[in-house]
Regions:
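Non-heme Fe(II)/2-oxoglutarate
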Residues: 3, 9-110
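Short alpha-helical segments and helix-capping/turn motifs at coil-helix boundaries
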Residues: 5-7, 131-132
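Catalytic core of non-heme Fe(II) oxygenases with the double-stranded beta-helix
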Residues: 87-188
Length: 188
C-alpha cells in the first residue's frame, strides 16, 4: 500500500493557490517499471505542434494514420483498463489500492468529497519536449485529480505542473521529481 503509506507518512498539504497535497514515493518500484515500459508513441518522432490540450492523441486528423475523419490515433497515453490490466499487474494493484476503503476514506476526508461510489481511472501519459497545457480548471465531474511523476532521467524539476490562481497568475510549480506527485479536488 505504497500510495496510502506515502499519504500517511510522506505527504504535505498546501493551500495556495488552492488546497492540494504533494506526495513523496507514492509508487512501488514495480509500478514505476511498468510505467517506463508502457508502449506509448514518442511525440518527438512525429513533429507535433502542441496546441495546449491532450487532443493530439486522437483529436486532430493530421496526427492520425489513415483518413482524417477516422483512422487510428497515435497513442500518447495509455489507460489501464480491464482489457489490458493483465499487462500491468503492478498498476492494477495501484487501482485496487485507490479503490480500497481505507484509501478512499482517507482521501475523501482530506478533499471533503465522498469517493465511495467514484470510478478510478489510471492512465500513463508521455509528456515530452515541447508539451504544454493551457491553464485550465478541471471539470466538476472529476472528483479528484492526481499526477505522479516518474523522472528517471534526472530532467529539470521545473518541468513539473504549474498552478495558477484565479487571476491566472502563476503561483507555484510542483517539482518534476522521481516518484513524486500531487492531488487535488476540483471545485467546491
Amino acid at each position: 500500500m505504497s500510495f496510502l503509506k506515502s499519504l500517511d507518512n510522506n505527504s504535505s498539504k498546501f493551500s495556495e493557490p488552492f488546497d492540494h497535497w504533494e506526495l513523496n514515493k507514492p509508487l512501488t518500484d514495480d509500478q514505476i517499471k511498468e510505467i517506463i515500459k508502457a508502449e506509448i508513441d514518442n511525440p518527438i518522432e512525429h513533429n507535433i505542434n502542441y496546441d495546449g490540450t491532450r487532443a493530439i492523441d486522437g483529436g486532430q486528423g493530421e496526427f492520425r494514420e489513415g483518413i482524417s475523419d477516422g483512422g487510428k490515433a497515435l497513442k500518447f497515453r495509455c489507460f489501464i483498463t480491464k482489457e489490458n490490466e493483465k499487462n500491468f499487474p503492478a498498476l492494477k494493484s495501484l487501482i485496487e489500492e485507490l479503490q480500497n476503503k481505507e484509501t478512499h476514506n482517507k482521501i475523501s476526508k482530506l478533499i471533503n468529497k465522498d469517493l465511495s461510489n467514484s470510478y478510478v481511472r489510471v492512465e500513463v501519459i508521455c509528456d515530452r519536449k515541447g508539451f504544454w497545457l493551457k491553464p485550465h480548471c478541471d471539470i466538476k465531474e472529476k472528483l479528484m485529480s492526481c499526477l505522479l511523476f516518474v523522472n528517471k532521467e534526472n530532467e529539470s524539476e521545473d518541468l513539473g505542473t504549474d498552478f495558477y490562481n484565479k487571476d491566472l497568475k502563476l503561483t507555484k510549480t510542483v517539482p518534476y521529481r522521481d516518484n513524486y506527485g500531487y492531488f487535488f479536488s476540483s471545485g467546491p
